[in-house]
Each structure stands twice: as C-alpha cells, then as structure tokens.
C-alpha cells in the first residue's frame, strides 16, 4: 500500500527524521492558510499523487510552458493562485502513463536552501532476507537513470534484521555519500531512525529523493515515498487509515474485496490464471504471439465459484479488453469450479469478446464437459501455447 508524501513525512517525523514543516491542503483557501502558518519567505506547492516525476509533469488543459506539479513561490497569494490552477486538474508524468492522475490535494511546505542532493532508500531484499540500503550522491534524479548512466555512483549494503544497525553501517552510508564530521553523525542518526520506522511499520520500501544538505550544513528529508506490506496492515490500523482509494484502480479495489491478486495493465487480452508463476508465463506467451496482456490476475489455489465469477466480472469491466484467456492448471484448484464460475459470470454479464479456456489438472474432464454443455461460444485450447495463439488470433481477427 502506498501513501502520499505528506503522510510519509508525518510517519517519518514520528521517528525523529528531519522533515520540513508543511501542511496538506484540499482547497485554495486551505493552501493559503497553510502558507500563512509557515510564514515564508519561500513556499513549495506540491501536487499529491501516487506517482513520481511530479516536478517535470504536465497538467492537462494548460499550455506547454505551464509549470509542473511542484512549484516554488514567494507569497501567500502565489500559493493561492497556483492551488487554484492545480487542484482538480490531471497531472501527467512519466510514471502515471498518458491517462495521468487527478490532483485532489496539495502539500504546502516551507522552502529549503539546498547545498547538496542525495538519494537514500531502504527496501526488502528477498534474496538475502535482509534490508537493503541504497545510497547515491546523485539525488533529485530517477534512480533508474542513475543506474543506467552512472551505475558506479550507486552504493548498496544490507542490514540483518537479527542484529539491526551497527556502526559499520553508519560508516558505509557516510562513505557512500561522502559525508564527514557533523554530517556523518547526522547520517548515522538518520539511518537509525529510518531503519526503526521501516521495521516497526512493516514497510516494503522507504525512499528519500532527495535527501539534502541545507545551506547551514544539516540533513533534511525533502521528499519521501513509503510503501507498506499489504499483508501486515491488520496490525497497523494507523497506516491503513491513510489509504487513498482515489489513487488506486477501481478494479484493483474490487479485486481486493475477494482476495484476488489483480494488477491492471495496458493491453487488450484479459487473463484469469491460478498461480503467480503461471500468470506471468501466460502474460509472456501472449506477448510472444504479438499481443499485450490487459491484466495480471491470480485467482489463487482455493477459489470458489463466487470468487471466479467476481474475477471474470472484473476483467470484463475493463473496456480495453478485446479477448479473454482463462488458463488453469488444477492442483488444489479444481477445473470444474473454474468452469462453473466462468459460466455463471458469462450468463450474468454477457460475453461480447472472444473467450479461450485452457484447463488441465484436477477434474479437468468434468470442467471441459461443463463448458461444452453450457452452449456458450467458448474456444477450447489444448495447452498454454495453443491457448495464447488462439486468443491472439481471435482478437486480431475481430478488429
């Protein structure tokens, strides 16, 4: 689960991290009031969306020379006028895709005199079962660009949760960022604070970009992104309360109600599969045959008829879907349950696009019989390759 920047900074501030003063605003009046509280002389008006690249982003409906989603201004009236222009508009960045995201809230923050910019993040390293720390002197840039152009400027080390942060980690961070003296001590303190927050709140990722050195030689968290392990939210009601569903795909929200693993993509072929590995393989083979998947959808191993019906309805709710591939390898999951769910969903919502079904495993013959006797126009597939080839051909033939 992701949260907004202003929420992320509030969470980090609870653990002592040095963040600038700021206030969230949902209206131009609230933005102006926030600026008055801060007092100036410099204010930063920040769009709050779950995507990066806000500063270089473009608002729909404004000219090509218009400012982006992060603006530096010098008066309360400028804060108000910029808020009026930004709120309610769609901001398009390299991370939002062409559809962009509507800006429904702003973060009004005090300005900062920047001497240096760094990148710092903590994330779960699944390979080592440790917390990986990534640091770079190239702050304020996309870390992916740094990794591509100057990979030698990215430094990583891991922290073992069994032992926590040690002085050797402090020295590694100071060396990676080129810090000495008082700044090295501040970096050590910050690492302690961030690691404590990361572990206490079950974070999946903590990213600060940029972490700055101010003109008076202190570290400050200028931007922060936090992502939390969704499976841990039951023990963090304070974090769960920060969820902003307007930033999420409505289909993904609906899928979560049925414990379905669903991620919307930009393609045209909807996929319903059991098992994450098989789902990824299904998406790969669709691309191999010249089309693009419209989603990742794993119904899991213990899906009921109702769950399968819900999954099918979520797929068909996407207007971009021009065909559907159901690919089930029944182990724990029974093929007859999938068949009954698909039929129930088709009868309820109708079938306006080609549907290819590949079943294999537990109760496969019964599943195939249920589908063949349903009277529905379903294309049967013998294996995964056959299924992908048939759905791609059906979609291209329907154009």
UniProtKB/Swiss-Prot annotation:
The lineage of its organism: Bacteria, Pseudomonadati, Pseudomonadota, Alphaproteobacteria, Caulobacterales. One of its GO terms (molecular function) is magnesium ion binding. SUPFAM superfamilies: Glutathione synthetase ATP-binding domain-like, Succinyl-CoA synthetase domains. Substrate binds at residues 274, 331-333. GO terms for cellular component: cytosol; succinate-CoA ligase complex. It catalyses: succinate + ATP + CoA = succinyl-CoA + ADP + phosphate; GTP + succinate + CoA = succinyl-CoA + GDP + phosphate. Its cofactor is Mg(2+). Its EC number is 6.2.1.5. Pathway: Carbohydrate metabolism; tricarboxylic acid cycle; succinate from succinyl-CoA (ligase route): step 1/1. Belongs to the succinate/malate CoA ligase beta subunit family. PANTHER family: SUCCINATE--COA LIGASE [GDP-FORMING] SUBUNIT BETA, MITOCHONDRIAL (PTHR11815:SF10), SUCCINYL-COA SYNTHETASE BETA CHAIN (PTHR11815). HAMAP family: Succ_CoA_beta (MF_00558). This is Succinate--CoA ligase [ADP-forming] subunit beta.
């Amino acid at each position: 689960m992701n949260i907004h920047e202003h929420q992320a900074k509030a969470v980090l501030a609870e653990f002592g991290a040095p963040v600038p003063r700021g206030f969230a605003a949902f209206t131009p009046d609230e933005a102006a009031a926030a600026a008055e509280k801060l007092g100036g002389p410099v204010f930063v008006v920040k769009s709050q969306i779950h995507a990066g690249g806000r500063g270089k982003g473009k608002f729909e409906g404004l000219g090509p020379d218009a400012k982006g989603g992060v603006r530096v201004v010098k008066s309360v009236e400028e804060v108000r006028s910029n808020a009026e222009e930004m709120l309610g508009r769609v901001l398009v960045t390299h991370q939002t895709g062409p559809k962009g995201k509507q800006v429904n809230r702003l973060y009004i923050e005090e300005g900062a005199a920047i001497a240096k910019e760094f990148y710092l993040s903590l994330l779960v390293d699944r390979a080592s079962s440790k917390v990986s720390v990534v640091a770079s002197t190239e702050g304020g840039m996309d870390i992916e660009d740094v990794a591509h152009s100057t990979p030698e400027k990215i430094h990583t080390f891991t922290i073992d949760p069994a032992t926590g942060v040690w002085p050797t980690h402090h020295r590694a961070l100071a060396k990676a960022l080129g810090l000495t003296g008082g700044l090295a001590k501040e970096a050590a303190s910050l690492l302690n604070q961030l690691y404590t927050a990361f572990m206490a709140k079950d974070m999946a990722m903590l990213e600060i970009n940029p972490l700055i050195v101010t003109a008076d030689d202190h570290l400050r968290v200028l931007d922060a992104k936090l992502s939390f392990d969704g499976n841990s939210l039951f023990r963090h009601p304070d974090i769960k309360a920060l969820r902003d569903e307007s930033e999420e795909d409505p289909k993904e929200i609906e899928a979560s109600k049925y414990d379905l693993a669903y991620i919307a993509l930009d393609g045209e072929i909807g996929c319903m599969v059991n098992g994450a590995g098989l789902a990824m393989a299904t998406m790969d083979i669709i691309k191999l045959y010249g089309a693009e998947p419209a989603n990742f959808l794993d119904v899991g191993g213990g899906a009921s008829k109702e769950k399968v019906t819900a999954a099918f309805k979520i797929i068909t709710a996407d207007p971009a879907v021009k065909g559907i591939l159901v690919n089930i390898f029944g182990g724990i999951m029974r093929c007859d349950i999938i068949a009954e769910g698909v039929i129930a969903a088709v009868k309820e919502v109708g079938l306006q696009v080609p549907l290819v079904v590949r079943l294999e495993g537990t109760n496969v013959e019964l599943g195939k019989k249920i589908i063949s006797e349903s009277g529905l126009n379903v294309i049967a597939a013998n294996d995964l390759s056959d299924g992908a080839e048939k759905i791609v051909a059906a979609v291209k033939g329907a154009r």
